[in-house]
């Protein structure tokens, strides 16, 4: 069984902040099988996340050799300079190795504190670490695309079952 929730902190966490609800609470009762997240989003990141009970599919979507695309909308504490954007595109040296953005662009050419970044890496907190290494604070981070899946039509905290066609495309590796 494959489920795609639109992960959000918002109302779910505000209702009972001491409970520290997780994405698994959002999909409780979605299916009889045990499902688990494919990849990860840290507690302060919102966006599309896939849950499945198919270990082979999870491996295909998370192993670096399969190069599955992730696109994030990044909100920064200040405008990103063109020089820093070029440096991110060329590659940034982090403590666990060099990371390259596959693509990066301003979300708005006038207000340059929001960018879209495409990466294939699944390293922990990689997008936040890229910007922090250059002196930026990530104010908000939203994953808008993962392996061909988007959160289109889903509000924060909502989820849906994948269509049979989506599952087949994922299994065949047809999505980036």
What is each stretch, according to the model?
Residues 9, 45-47, 68-72:
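Short glycine-/polar-rich loops that comprise or flank the Walker A/P-loop
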Residues 56-115:
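Non-catalytic RNA-recognition surface used by pseudouridine synthases
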Residues 90-93, 97-176:
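RNA substrate-recognition surfaces in RNA-acting enzymes
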Residues 11, 20, 32, 44, ...:
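Short, charged/polar surface micro-motifs in flexible loops or helix N-caps
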Residues 6, 50, 74:
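Residue-level signal for inorganic ion chemistry
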Residues 2-13:
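Single conserved hydrophobic/aromatic residue that forms the stacking wall/gate
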Residues 29-63:
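Glycine/acidic-rich beta-strand-loop module
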Residues 17-33:
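Substrate-gripping "pore-loop 1 plus following alpha2 helix"
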